[in-house]
Amino acid sequence: MVTTMTERPVPKMIYPHNYERKIGIDSIRLLLKERCLSSLGKLLVDEMAFCKDAATINEWLEQVREFRRLRQERADVPLTFFFDVRPALKRIRLENTHFEVEELFDFRRSLDTIHRLVAFIRGLDEELDEDGHIAEKHYEALYQLADGVATFPILIQQADQIVDKFGHVRDTASPELNQIRRELR
């Protein structure tokens, strides 16, 4: 068994090595990659493998159905910024290293998008019906998918103290920078 980034076990590829091309799966992968919002999504498409577990396949299909329906019914789904910041995160693990400004800005926007998307999905099933009661869960699979996702709002707040909404370093990012910029004015 092979494990993807989503930590779900999937079977190894079917022999022969060109099986996907022979049955047209490679063209489906290309179509999926065209719709990905980030390079990380494209990587996940590359990692997809055949699955023969009916329950898992049905779960994935329900997630897709719900998300397609959600995109058709709601124009306000927060899907604005998804950046693959893994290289920067790997680099800053070393002591005395830090994000470059652009990396921090991408990291902040990605975290914010994830935070808003998870809150949006969680809020879907808390909406009230016409009688003022909590509406029936119409997006159960998406709700389950979002359940337990950590969104790190404190990191978003800390990044906001350093960069503004345009990705520029704030004068108040540090006392030293604030002093230098005041002296330059």
Describe the predicted segments one by one.
Residues 2-169, 173:
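Conserved amphipathic alpha-helical "coupling/scaffold" segments
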Residues 177-185:
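Extended, Lys/Arg-enriched charged tracts that mediate electrostatic binding to polyanionic substrates
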